[in-house]
């Protein structure tokens, strides 16, 4: 049963389905306020008392502000744009989607340890927190999806699930060690966890040597802004927009445009229904570039123990 706080979302869904629902200005205003800031609809005694994470706020604000320098002519070049796109694929596609998510968080497939460590480096360069935070919080998200303990519970609004949850010291952070016992003792993981910024600085120095400040602005700051928001859309948009193919006991949706931006992560309802699956796009038209990459690694003999959902879930697959 849907939470009563999501009634405005139901209205919008019906509107998108060509229903004859008509909103007046006040209803529209109430809808958008509650859609983006759902906690405003909670009674005062139900609102969590959270402490702002000022370091995180400063970090994300700084990244976005420096990225604006890309609009200045002296920091633009097509080579710099190309470098940003290449690093977006490496850090967002290989690092986050293939590495942190499908390989490490869910163990949907296994690769040689040296290749897994490459995934960890690439994911660390995405600057979405250390590998322990990313994996631990993601595992919590699946265990408590769209309920109060979920770090980015979509009932609290689009803004909260997109970025707001990172702006506060949420209680879930204290449980990260409990959800990452399988990787906590790995020395390489520890190195990447403890040297997140230094690894990014090292990449910045390499980029500066290759192409000066345009490469740094585009390859670090602009690239991070895109990787950030495209990843965050998986937490926010795919719990609000799209269609449901499988029962998953939460609000996860399959959202085609998020899938295009995130190498197949947008087939989120499929993923929540079969969390262990290396393949998220289960229909022939649900393009999943990450699954294609896993199949390629399998052909090379590098990806093994690949987990897939039952055949009935992929009855119409290509």
Swiss-Prot record:
Reactions performed catalytically: a 1-octadecanoyl 2-acyl-glycerolipid + 2 reduced [2Fe-2S]-[ferredoxin] + O2 + 2 H(+) = a 1-[(9Z)-octadecenoyl]-2-acyl-glycerolipid + 2 oxidized [2Fe-2S]-[ferredoxin] + 2 H2O
Localization: Cellular thylakoid membrane
Motif (Histidine box-2): 138-142
Required cofactor(s): Fe(2+)
Segment forming the signal sequence: none
Motif mapping: Histidine box-1: 101-106
Gene Ontology MF terms: oxidoreductase activity, acting on paired donors, with oxidation of a pair of donors resulting in the reduction of molecular oxygen to two molecules of water
Source organism, top-level taxon: Bacteria
Motif stretch (Histidine box-3): 271-275
Domain notes: The histidine box domains are involved in binding the catalytic metal ions.
Name by which UniProt lists this protein: sn-1 stearoyl-lipid 9-desaturase
């Amino acid at each position: 049963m849907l939470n009563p706080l999501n009634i405005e979302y139901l209205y919008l869904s019906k509107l998108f389905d060509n229903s004859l629902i008509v909103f007046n200005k006040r209803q529209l205003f109430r809808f958008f306020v509650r859609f983006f800031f759902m906690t405003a609809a909670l009674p005062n005694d139900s609102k969590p008392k959270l402490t702002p994470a000022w370091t995180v706020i400063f970090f994300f604000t700084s990244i976005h502000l420096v990225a604006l320098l890309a609009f200045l002519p002296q920091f633009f070049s097509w080579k710099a744009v190309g470098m940003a796109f290449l690093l977006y694929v490496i850090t967002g596609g290989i690092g986050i989607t293939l590495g942190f998510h499908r390989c490490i968080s869910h163990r949907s497939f296994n690769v040689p340890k040296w290749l897994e460590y490459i995934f960890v480096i690439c994911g660390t360069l995405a600057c979405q927190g250390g590998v322990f935070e990313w994996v631990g919080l993601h595992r919590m998200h699946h265990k408590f999806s769209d309920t109060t303990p979920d770090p980015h519970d979509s009932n609290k609004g689009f803004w909260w699930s997109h970025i707001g949850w990172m702006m506060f010291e949420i209680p879930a952070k204290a449980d990260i060690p409990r959800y990452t016992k399988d990787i906590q003792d790995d020395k390489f993981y520890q190195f990447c966890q403890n040297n997140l910024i230094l690894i990014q600085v090292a990449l910045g120095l390499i980029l500066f040597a290759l192409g000066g400040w345009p490469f740094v602005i585009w390859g670090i700051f602009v690239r991070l802004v895109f990787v950030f928001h495209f990843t965050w859309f998986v937490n926010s948009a795919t719990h609000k927009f799209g269609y449901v193919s499988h029962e998953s006991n939460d609000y996860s949706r399959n959202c085609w445009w998020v899938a295009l931006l995130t190498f197949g992560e947008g087939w989120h309802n499929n993923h929540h229904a079969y969390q262990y699956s290396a393949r998220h796009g289960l229909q022939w038209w649900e393009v999943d570039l990450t699954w294609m990459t896993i199949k390629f690694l399998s052909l090379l003999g590098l990806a093994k123990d690949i987990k897939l959902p039952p055949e009935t879930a992929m009855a119409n697959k290509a």
